[in-house]
Amino acid sequence: FDNVLAKELVNRGVDISFEHEVVDVIFNEDGTSKTSIKDEEGNLYFVHAKHIIDSSGYGRVLPRLLDLDKPSAIPEHSSIFAHVKDSRRPDGEEGTLITFDVLDKDTWLWVIPFSNGDTSIGFVGLTEFIDSFEGDTSERLQSMLKHSKYYHDRFEGLDFNFPPVSIKNFSKSVKQLYGKGYALTGNSAEFLDPVF
């Protein structure tokens, strides 16, 4: 999805540099800035700006460089997810919908069908809940699927395309959302969701 958006921006004339790393940002008194960037070959170059909008997502460039990180007020949540070859996907519209099975106020299962026939499935819940299941990540995710009355039969026994990934305590926060010369947006500001 991000790649589709990036390509459309390039089509509309926006300059986007891929595989470049922001290594430093210096802000002046008036809010203007000088950003040091390293390209894919390690060459350093600089960009001067009146304002910076940080949409770096979970990379959280400005929060990291400006020491803006702070613990999240959101309770500790974790996730566990994988992709499967969705051999029992329903025909018609239902098989194309991104859906959630909310097990309780703190726990849900996502089901995200891809056009290639694979589906991303994953649980988000309190870390205590995620950690309550025993075994390796495959055994844990299979056990969790038993808690979904709606999706259990569809995904029971299907092989995972890769060993399920577990991400613990993924929520992040910042001390402030903006300052002189910059603003944080999206997941660089307050990261709530796991990668799926």
Where do the language-model regions lie?
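Predominantly flavin-linked oxidoreductase catalytic cores and closely associated redox partners
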Residues: 7-155
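A conserved beta-strand/loop capping segment in the N-terminal third of enzymes
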Residues: 1-4
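FAD/FMN-dependent oxidoreductases across multiple families
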Residues: 129-196
